[in-house]
Amino acid sequence: AYEIRPSLVGSEMCIRDRADAVTPAVLAYEGIQYQYLAPGIFSDTQWDYVNRHLNILSGFYGVLCPSDAVIPYRLEMQTKLETENATDLYHFWNNQLYQALYCKFEKDSPKELINLASAEYSKAVLPYLTEDVHCVTCVFGEFVQGKVKVKATLAKMARGEMVRWMAEHQIQTAEDLKQFTGLGFEFEESLSSGTEYVFLKKDICPED
């Protein structure tokens, strides 16, 4: 006969509880953009596409693939979190998120990055862009009084919708994004540039 120490039992139960809580990253998040991404109804082809092309930025984990196992957590990139060597998460991660993304590019192939992250997370990547990477940031808004006005909720919906659309149509280049018309948005050439694609609600367009 032998006796198991209570501390070991507690540790094992904790490990099992955490194992039960693990879920693929793209299914673990419940924000508006993920609701419109709707990964729960993906086809096998769509799953394959996002696993090859989609990267999720996390203040806790860093750069995640959609199928990476995670335990649900609450930690936003803007959270003040001082460590021994950093004053916040931007300082903590420094250029590591960009380097992780850069390593995913195939050697000697064109390097194109589609930025559908919020401004909060974009700040952790865009300052470190290298000259050999063409990055396009997508902006979703309405044209109000001569300016593009971005509404946070609508933009989140559109970002998720665009990723789902990209997976459905197997989009391969930034140029192909101009065909996106989800949620009533249309690409607006006159307000866009080579590094920023502006999509406006089609019933609210710039004056001629």
Q: Locations of the language-model features?
A:
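Internal, well-folded beta-alpha domain core
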Residues: 39-193, 198-208
